[in-house]
A protein has these predicted regions:
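Intramolecular chaperone/auto-protease modules of tailspike-like proteins
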Residues: 1-119
């Protein structure tokens, strides 16, 4: 929520430009669609800069949990396997919308620098 009544420790003066410069945008394709190139981030790299925007843990895999209906010979804590016997990744993701405040603050900082240089 954006309601001020739900927030505390509000700070307006922080160096967004320095933080933004730590992000490493990349061009890549997904293994499932080798013919399509996209621009984005690698989640584990972005997590070091904007952890609030990243979900999951690098290299995590799906595991069987207590309460799951366990197949024969499987225990809670064992890795889940696909039909080919490969571990099933628990992939990371990035909520791109959570990058918007950082981008806006960086634009404002750069605009202030331009204005100062033009003065």
């Amino acid at each position: 929520s954006s309601d001020y009544r739900l927030k505390e420790n509000v700070v307006y003066d922080w160096d967004a430009t320095a933080r933004l410069k730590q992000l490493k945008p990349a061009r890549f394709n997904f293994i499932t669609d080798a013919n399509k190139t996209v621009d984005g981030f690698l989640a584990h790299e972005a997590q070091a800069v904007v952890p609030e925007a990243v979900t999951g843990t690098k290299d995590a895999v799906e595991v069987w949990k207590d309460g799951d209906e366990l197949p024969d010979g499987v225990s809670a804590g064992d890795n889940k396997l696909d039909a080919d016997g490969n571990t099933m990744p628990n992939v990371q993701g990035i909520d791109q919308a959570k990058l918007v405040p950082l981008l806006v603050k960086t634009i404002l900082e750069l605009e202030a620098r331009i204005t100062a240089l033009e003065a």
